[in-house]
Every structure is written in C-alpha cells, then in structure tokens.
Amino acid sequence: MKKFMMAIVAVLFAAPSFAQYSSGGFSLSESSVYYGLRLGMNMATLTGDDVDAGTKVGLNFAPVIGLRVSDTTPIFLESGLYFTGCGAKKDKASISLNYLEVPILIKYGIQATDDIAVLPFLGPTFRYGLFGGKTKIPGEGKVDSFGDDKFKRADVGIKLGCGAEYNKLYLEAGYQFGITNIANWQLDNDDDASVHNGAFFINVGVNF
C-alpha cells in the first residue's frame, strides 16, 4: 500500500512538468485522436451469496487511446489495456482478483474553459482473471482465487463516471459493477451461487 501511494504521489508531482512542457492547452474542437496513461486505485468489494465482504484497495494502471467519432459533436470512444485489482477484504480474510481489463467507453466532452474539459463517460468493460490472485483464509493459508469451486476468470461489467482534463493532466472517478456471475460453486442446496464485482475508482494521468 505504501509503494502504491508513493507511485500516486510521483505521478502528481511529475504531471505538472509534463503539462508545462506540452505545447498549448486542451481543446475539444482540435482533438481527434489522443493517447494517455492512467494510474489509480479501486475501492473494491464483492456482493452476493456466501460473501460477507468489506472493501479492498487495488491498483489500476493502463495505457489508453481515444478517438473522436463525430466531426460535429465532441463524442469520443476510449479504450485501453488495464491491469486492475479487485476483490474484497474483511478482518484477516481477503480475496484478491487481478484482471486484465479492456473497457469501451463513450465520452462526451464539455469545454468548461479554454484549458479545462469535463468528460462524463459510460460503457462496457471486459475482464479476464490473471495468475497471482489469491484468497487468504485465516488458519488455512492462501489458495488460488480462480478455478473450480472458486471464481470464474471472465467478467463483464459496466463502467461509468466523469473525468476532467487540464492542460493534458487528467483526473477521473467513477464506479464499475459486474454483470457476470463470477461464482464457480454451488450452495448447500445445490443452487448456483451468485457473486458480482463492484468498485469505486479514482485515476490520475496524462493525455497527449
């Protein structure tokens, strides 16, 4: 957690230098394609059957690309390849679910000032579980989070939120919720269990 916070601080200190180096301010009327980097955190949890979970902090990191899809209105399509940490934690027990994530977001740009743009967004996100995710059970040690009688690797969700850009610096916050049932086990009555991802997130970054 300490290393993660140091990384966030480093981005915040480095970003003004990048923005000062970059020529000109942001203009929705001039932007057709942009590239960017995102770094931030999830405040993730799990909801559903057999889950009594609190919030777990996870990492977000991604390169992204955005494309303007209309010449007459500031509508953008943004995607990227995220490493994102989800899961849940309560007391000494924890569930870590690490994913590669590809969102497909529709963003609408609102030019607030010459240098500031506000961009609300909404879209689906597609995730696949990576190796390294562990479930920690007190007294039983750690086991893999994905597999039979555990969690499914594939997940589809919805991501929504709002971003703001100032001189190429970018800040966004929002919420993502899973549509897919990621539980890969049955309840005591032989019914399929139902568990879904959910997370508030905040990211900082740059667009160029």
Q: Could you describe each region identified by the protein language model?
A:
Residues 1-29:
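Cleavable N-terminal export/targeting peptides
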Residues 76-78, 82, 86-92, 147, ...:
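Predominantly the C-terminal beta-signal and adjacent terminal strand-loop region
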